[in-house]
Amino acid sequence: MKQEEEKLTGLPENAFRALKPGEVYNPLMSPDKKYPEVNLWSVLWGIAMAILFSAAAAYLGLKVGQVFEAAIPIAIIAVGVSGAAKRKNALGENVIIQSIGASSGVIVAGAIFTLPALYILQESYPEEITVTFTQVFISSLLGGVLGILFLIPFRKYFVSDMHGQYPFPEATATTQVLVSGEKGGSQAKPLLLAGIIGGLYDFIVATFGWWNENFTTRVCGFGEMLAEKAKLVFKVNTGAAVLGLGYIVGLKYASIICAGSLAVWWIIIPGMSLIWGDSVLNQWNPEITATVGAMAPEEIFKYYAKSIGIGGSAMAGIIGIIKSWSIIKSAVGLAAKEMGGKADAKANVKRTQRDLSMKIIAIGSIITLVLVTLFFYFDVMQGNLLHTLVAILLVAGISFLFTTVAANAIAIVGTNPVSGMTLMTLILASVVMVAVGLKGPGGMVAALVMGGVVCTALSMAGGFITDLKIGYWLGSTPVKQEAWKFLGTIVSAATVGGVMIILNKTYGFTSGQLAAPQANAMAAVIEPLMNGVGAPWLLYGIGAVLAIVLNFCKIPALAFALGMFIPLELNVPLVVGGAVNWYVTSRSKDAALNAERGEKGTLLASGFIAGGALMGVVSAAMRFGGVNLVNDAWLNNTWSEVLALGAYAILIFYLVKASMKTK
């Protein structure tokens, strides 16, 4: 036993580098032995994590349009509880807890990027559109199941064949947390403390409104004049959760996102006002009656500039598919070979290489697609067979093709570009469904539910490759991770549906209190297409050309385009958090000390995210119950913004100082 415990103290030295010819990677848990993995302990804790983090991620995602990855905080909690319970050989159990629990973030990302658009459009069409829990739950559930089934044939390629070729940033961080199980106590303390600080901070803002959530340059007369005359404005969200998110995203990626945002807010919006100030540009939206010069910067963003970002995101998704074509071909070839192989070949496969069989995947995929077809036919398409068949072909084709794009993005940057790919799906679905005769509010619902299924499938595919890579490094049994991922999907889909209903009834997606930027973008794309007004193809085209140019210049087009349609105040804090990350990891000449400080900061940032998001859900539940303690008159006072800036500075100071203190 002692010998085995010594063996489990660190990853092999070849875990992160490419293997030499003939070299084999041997994971921590030996492929020739059996370890505790799936049992009552791991399953119950996995379910608890899925519920907890689904609620938190749904709130934060709808609030700021960014979903934090739950894998790291869940891994920390799993290590902490197994250590507290003094469980022996808990590594395999912790992987299962993490795998079931991490369904939360991916299901949330899939659901909240599309389905709130149903509520947004319901405001405009209250009689024609009704949104039910069943629609949200079933589209999230079936999309998640499709994502799991479509990804499994690609597992071997991404986690084993390409060993050392992809950085897998999030999987690396999560694996290190799980490996350092003996650090459970010391890691849990800063996470818990930061969770309390971040939670209280965001709770005070959301529940009591002691200071403003955003700081803007409109706080002074000169800033007000700049916004009105030159259409120049600067904004920053001062929340703890978004600051933590920026730290984990890192300075490089956050800077690219923010660059996209600044290009829109400081170049395109003022430029449009300068060039077309006296014009009424309403070719794509007859409801626009004001001249561009008479609009506030926020209105120019909403009606025009955001569409350029939408076009850029869609093109970035297409570029991703083109780059992944060889991966798709090789995985399909491997799957076909196994389908034609002999049954007894399975017995010789090592424990750490066992997947669900291709026959189960094929049958499961067919059953899931049949269920999606029935859901579309009876609920979404109102019994129209042609519309249903066209919809299922689109959903199945796009979900499968984009699976590799999602997995590839996660493997390289740890960020799933699912919203851009879903936007392309919605544009394509809307154009095709209009061509086969489905228009108006019914067409909007159909396109959004189709988008919801695709978005959740792609989000799941991207997130699940992280879990499988963690399992590969540690020596888990893939088939167990794959089988129990379905349970996490069911629990997360149900939780997200409930949270979305509560948030809509409490705040409403059109109130401005929930940014839901992706869902608003989806609604903005679909409505003109389905009403025969036509879409702003010129603006989409400008965005698409920009994405091609960015890709040519080796700049991540998707990150830049995302920044273009996510509000400025939510992108600036990402850079602030990223800058804190850079600062704490570059102060010393000792690389090991810098790495240690970076890990400490990741723990604190995870605490900010989890605490801030969870207390955001509590605050929303209080509002839902009729408790509203916010003084709106104070929040409209400029001093509430000044106070917000002061509180934000203290929070940043704490994050820097606490991250630098590693002993």
Regions found by a protein language model. Name each.
Residues M1-K663:
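Alpha-helical multipass membrane-protein architecture
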